[in-house]
Amino acid sequence: MLAEAKRIRDRFDAELRAIYVGEQTEETSQTFREAFAQLQLPIDSTIYYEGGGEPAEAILRALAREKIGLVVAGALEKEVVLHQFLGNVARRLVREAVCSVILFTKPQVKPKALRCIVFIADYSEHGLQALKTTLPFAEAESCERLYVIRIITAFDEARASIGSNAADPRDNKTNDDEEDALEKFVLSAGATEVPIETRCIRGNTGLAASDFVRSVTADLLVVPMRKNIRSLPSNIAWVTDVIPCNLWVIR
């Protein structure tokens, strides 16, 4: 996990700090020094020892107290055929952390490049800034394909079907309108060398997006999420339970 965190540190030219849920002992201090040295990290890197209590609470407390901008953690509690389920700590980080979160499903000592990335678009200002943050990261990862997708559920389409009675005509969009809006959203993020493909994903529920992520064998799913909002929109709420690949929640 520390190797994956170092990769993220390098991508953002940031300072790496560690959170350890437990008491500081000479043994744990030595273990960290050895791990830091192996990864060519400063051996005096900051470690927050959060002794006692429930792990998720301890981590959330440290993130808020130290004003951390991004936390990198492991994702999985269990895995069954075709589905990977978030562990309790990871789930609470996604819902409650005051900062951005990156979760790795299978962290590796020698991290592999994230060649295929899926970004879930929303047309808010935060969503646009999140895409602008994703583009240089994807370029640094030598991303071969960045899918920017818009999730359209049966509920969304039912709401649009009564658009003629809606106060806002933008609620009544045709398929072409949706595709055009998504293209304009991507173009507004600026130029990039990363190959981008836009897709409108339709399904009865937002889980259709999870199916799409698996179908393209994505390495990373990126989800914009505004700060101080614990409840994800219904069409992407599934990411707090089933995680199809590594996950980056941008706050």
Where are these regions (language model features)?
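Conserved residues at the C-terminal ends of beta-strands
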Residues: 74, 120, 149, 202, ...
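Gly/Ser-rich helix-loop-strand patches that form or flank binding pockets
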Residues: 59-110, 211-251
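Structural beta-alpha unit
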Residues: 7, 23-27, 31-71, 187-221, ...
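Small/aliphatic-rich secondary-structure junction motif
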Residues: 1-45, 116-168, 188-191, 195, ...
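A short acidic, glycine-rich active-site loop
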Residues: 167-177
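Amphipathic coiled-coil/heptad-repeat helices and related helical stalk/stem segments
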Residues: 1, 55-56, 86, 130, ...
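Surface-exposed, flexible loop/turn segments at secondary-structure boundaries
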Residues: 24-26, 79, 109, 125, ...
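Well-ordered, non-membrane alpha-helical segments in soluble/globular domains
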Residues: 178-183
